[in-house]
UniProtKB/Swiss-Prot annotation:
This is tRNA(Ile)-lysidine synthase. The keyword Chaperone does not apply. It comes from Mannheimia succiniciproducens (strain KCTC 0769BP / MBEL55E). Belongs to the tRNA(Ile)-lysidine synthase family. Ligates lysine onto the cytidine present at position 34 of the AUA codon-specific tRNA(Ile) that contains the anticodon CAU, in an ATP-dependent manner. Cytidine is converted to lysidine, thus changing the amino acid specificity of the tRNA from methionine to isoleucine.
């Protein structure tokens, strides 16, 4: 048992770690190894976090088990309950909820340590192969990476599950078994419980071979990215993280896809399928010049505007939204747009939204905040009536932000687009 610990401690160079602790075998092994490491390195600090997904009838028991284990070994533990959005599947929703919860607790000087091991790597590789992934997907998991903007460390990646089980048993620590691990309707469980045991009876070192293959794929991915970096920097705007596609037709189709993958990786997005990537190139990048194309990827949207690709949230349609507003009121706006307030000051109505303020003449008509208008406006005394679309274009406001800007209406008369312009009254 000293061999596994000696190998483990050689990989740990961080001073502070937050362990994702489910109470299962793998994370229990990681917890026990870190506890022993702390005995040898007094300056090494670690905590644990248990995410209560609420998906199993045993979820409360698992949380209690984790509390008992951590109390037994004097390990600080955070238990965080989350709500899982199942719209994109339970596994994806649980993963996203888990990482978002962890992000709220991970200190700036900590890394998140997960207990992924060699068998997990094999499963991840084969699942990527099943999806038809390229070398980036077949790179599977790396010892260090960034997920949801969190620094992830996987110190057990070269150990087998059997090694971890032997170690935990030697420490006489109990662990929990998730009943869903026996449900072979999940692809990962199907591989783990049915396919891989048969493969390993024929090829005993299959896991180690897959690990090497994943490393080869990772190196190829790194090499491609390194060779593309100079070209990528010419079209990547660091300030707004956009990608210029003005000269995209000069690149080969293969290079177009590689540059897009590199951009998406910089934005820390899951890689789209080959079909999705081809659709993005065809329907967004090379859409008609006057089009307003967009492409939904998971819960975000890639949009083209003025020959640049932007990544935005999947915003709600606010076309029919109208929010009444009265003097001395502060009211919430929809879809995470914050609050807008109205007060009377020195004979004017003062509207405040975010860091913007608009002063308008007082009125007795009902006041509403809307988000859509398709008529003409006049911005200056000697100006002409212009279509509002032209006004937005002259201000270089992207189409999706136009429909998220509070429009102040006195009755049915547009008075101002907060932060951008006021309408001139004749």
């Amino acid at each position: 048992m000293s061999d596994i610990f000696n190998q483990f401690q050689q990989q740990i160079y961080q001073q502070k770690i937050l362990i994702a602790f489910s109470g299962g075998l793998d994370s229990t092994a990681l917890l026990a190894l870190c506890k022993k490491l702390q005995e040898n390195r007094p300056h090494f600090q670690f905590r644990a976090i248990h995410i209560h997904h609420g998906l199993s009838p045993n979820a409360d028991k698992w949380a209690l088990h984790c509390e008992n284990i951590c109390r037994q070994f004097s390990i600080p533990l955070i238990v965080e309950k989350v709500r899982v959005d199942k719209s994109n599947g339970i596994e994806a929703g649980a993963r996203e909820a888990r990482y978002h919860a962890i992000a709220n607790h991970l200190n700036i000087d900590e890394v998140l340590a997960t207990a992924h091991h060699l068998n997990d790597q094999t499963e991840t590789f084969l699942l990527a192969l099943k999806r038809g992934s390229g070398v980036q997907g077949l790179s599977a998991m790396q010892k260090e990476s960034v997920v949801f903007n969190l620094p992830i460390f996987r110190p057990l990646l070269q150990f087998t599950r059997a090694q971890l089980e032997d170690y935990v048993k030697s420490q006489k620590i109990n662990w929990i078994e998730d009943e869903s691990n026996e449900d072979n309707s999940y692809d990962r469980n199907f591989l783990r419980n049915i396919i891989l045991p048969k493969m390993k009876t024929r090829w005993a070192h299959f896991d180690q071979a897959v690990y090497r293959a994943a490393q080869h794929c990772f190196e190829q991915t790194q090499l491609v990215n390194e060779l593309l970096e100079d070209e990528f920097q010419k079209i990547f705007e660091k300030n707004d993280r956009t990608l210029s596609v003005k000269l995209f037709d000069r690149y080969s189709y293969i290079k177009q896809k590689a540059l897009l993958r590199l951009w998406l990786a910089r934005l820390q997005l899951a890689m789209p399928s080959q079909k999705q990537l081809e659709q993005l190139i065809r329907d967004v990048i090379f859409a008609k010049p006057d089009a307003i194309p967009q492409f939904k990827l998971a819960n975000q949207v890639i949009r083209r505007y003025q020959q640049k690709l932007y990544l935005t949230a999947d915003f709600a349609d606010l076309t029919d939204v109208a929010v009444p507003l009265k003097i001395s009121q502060t009211v919430p706006l929809p879809d995470g747009l914050g609050h807008i307030s109205l007060r009377e000051q020195s004979g004017c109505f003062v509207f405040s939204w975010r860091h913007y303020q608009v002063q308008l003449p007082p009125c007795k008509q009902p006041i509403e905040i809307r988000f859509a208008y398709s008529g003409k406006v006049k911005l200056h005394k000697n100006g002409v009536n212009q279509d509002i679309k032209k006004v937005w274009q002259n201000l270089n406001v992207p189409p999706w932000l136009r429909n998220r800007t509070p429009l102040i209406f006195y009755g049915d008369q547009l008075k101002s687009a907060v932060g951008f312009f006021k309408v001139f009254d004749c």
